[in-house]
Amino acid sequence: MSKRKLIPKLSIQSPVLHTNLNVQSTHPPLKKEDLHRISKDSLESDSESLTQEIMCHSEFDDRIRGNGMEPDSLDEEESPRWGSLHEMEEEASGKAAQMAREQNHHTWDQGANNRQQPIEDKYSDLRYDPNWKSKKEEGQLLSVEALPESTDSSLENLPLAPLYPSQETSMELSGGKGEQKESPQSAASLLGSEFLSPNYEHGARRSKPFSELSDSDLEEKSSSLSPYVKSSSSHNEVFLPGSRGPRRRKSKQHFVEKNKLTLGLPTPKTDSYLQLHNKKRGESHPEQISYPVRVTDKTSIQNAKEMENAAIDPEDKWHQRAQQLKNYQEHWSQYESTKSSNVPRGQPSDMVNDHQPSRRPAKLKIRKQCKHQNGLKSSTTEEVTASQGNQNNPPRQQQNQNKPLDTSTKPESIVIMHASNNDVQASRALRSHNLKETSNTFAPPKQAFDKVLSKNSTGCDSGLNVNKERGHKDQEEKRFSYQQLHTLSDMDLNNLNELSKRHVLLSQKGSQFVYHINTHGSTKNKKQLKQPYTETKYRNLEMLWKFHSSSDSQTVRASPDSWLTQIMEQHQQALVQLTDVQPSEGALSSVTLPPILSRVESESQLSSERSQRNQVKISRSNSEGYLFQLEKGKKHKKRSSSKNTKLKGYQKRDVKLGGLGPDFESIRDKTQKLIQQKEYAKQVKEYNMKTLSILSKPQTEKTQKKSAIPRQKALEYAKTIPKPKPSNLTHQASKEQKNPTYAGKEESLPEISLLEILQNRHEREKQAVAAFKVLHIV
């Protein structure tokens, strides 16, 4: 089985192996016109890959039948379903081989003359399909069939599954390369490159149900797989966007959807906001969905309820998923608080986060090769969140055992859960940046990590549960992880700051109980648990690590209080030295910093500097030493700036200024002059006030006299003026005289001779207008 290789459809995501089904696309088989568009070289490679796929399928079926079923993965009642699935797989592989032979035969006969023939029906999706309901039900049944065979296999596939199965249906063997090449090439040649995107090609590959199965077989298969829908498929529906409901066909249809948008026709939303955001990001991290591996019965019940809400809009689905993520976080926090008091924790929480996605494929390959070489069965569970020395223990045994190796896996799984939940919002924008940094920082320790994994793989082959052997391996892994903490980037440490503080305290409490049971590795664990606690407390400053010496990476034998005080001193030294001193990176480990002045000394230093400035200002008032004091101040500034750049100058900052003090006599003279000026000003003020008061009195008297004289004159003149006589009678008489003259004039006016002429003319015109109206001319 060493020839078999797992080939993912999306290179970014981790592989997933579905051993039960050979999935075919929902589109009808490629026609002759499409096949002529493919070159002869690709057809030869396709035929060879199909033969290899058939051989791999036959070997895989023989191996499964020879080994039988594993007791942990399948029950005895599922044997008929297992056989029916194998029959379906054989029939599907036979049909695929027959189809490929016919395609090769037609293409070699007809040649490349018909390469530019169009597709017969491009607008099939716009026409009414009477069988739409049956196709919808078949798509739902296939999503049920594509699930893992058991809860253990779901545990194996969940951490490795891609985040968005709408773009990727399943993993195929290396023989299936040819089928994957044909459909995108034909679609691209017909529609053009402008209508095809990388997401479009992957979205076009959909799984369809087997047409040779009857309705009764499909019903039996759905009923037999119903218990696993509640346990594992509901998790995919909740945490994997785009997995619920039948998937729409996207191939050969993008230009039609574009026309629908231009015409204003309503089109259903195929992608939710979360899917579009992650497509732009272009990355998928499997550890974000690995935390529900240890989900209890409550979570399975909650996930089973999601099957009823499969027909909700994508936006509502997104809101429901966000709410359930919050519920899972609360549930796991309660689970963690209950388990921390009962179950000892022997491993720090930062150890899991050291395993970055860049090293995860190597880890998985080593484990899979280990299992294939020793003849283990394919349906065994591979828990990514578990530690390397505890692969063979199921999750149920970990709750009831007090061994340090078994209990060490629990903080790891909880840490992964919190990291995925807390970083859903914050870490998406930082993922690309973190990957670039971690790929450079983790390059040297990768070889040592592979060595540790090889030791652990041999340990899982032997199957021994001896505490001594596993204790040594765990200690080696812990040492490696602690050395790795120094190479972590600052962004990753900030994301896990609050989480690691909480779990390191719990791990220290749990480790005290573990030491009574396993006395072999008690002393080493105590030394190793102190270091991540202190490191997580000061990880936010990246310069802190630069000022650590090479001896800090080793285990410390001092008490935790002395270790904390030592790190606090180093931290303060780093903060103070960063303002003035920036040594080279090569001499970081050998630089010894000077002692820091205490707060009292720094305050006295500030007060002395202020007094020096005041003295300079006061001495500037003297005309004799003004220029001398300026030059002296400039020299002092130059000396202080030059001394700050060196460590020796930093130590000798408190400098005493020499020279003459302030001239007190000149100050006294100035004060006396100021006092005399004030007194003179007061005297002048008093004199002016007196003079103003004397001048103002006669002026007021004169003004009063002047104002009284003209008033009296006016009153006297008014008395002499005679009163006017009333003139009412004269006005009335004059009016009476005028009115009769006006009336006589009106009576004496001659009559207008033209008035009668105008009246006659008006009547004539009226008659003419009436005649026009009768004739309907007007």
UniProtKB/Swiss-Prot annotation:
Biased composition (Basic and acidic residues): 118-139, 733-746
Source species, domain of life: Eukaryota
Segments of skewed composition (Basic residues): 358-371, 633-650
Ranges of biased composition (kind: Low complexity): 223-234, 390-402
Chain intervals with Polar residues compositional bias: 334-344, 375-389
Any single biological process term in GO: establishment of localization in cell
Gene Ontology, cellular component aspect: extracellular region
Keywords: Cilium biogenesis/degradation
UniProt cross-references to InterPro entries, sorted A to Z: JHY
Region called Disordered, residue ranges: 62-271, 334-408, 631-654, 721-746
Role description: Required for the normal development of cilia in brain ependymal cells lining the ventricular surfaces.
PANTHER family cross-referenced by the UniProt entry: JHY PROTEIN HOMOLOG
Identification of the protein by name: Jhy protein homolog
Organism whose genome encodes this protein: Homo sapiens (Human)
Encoding gene per record: JHY
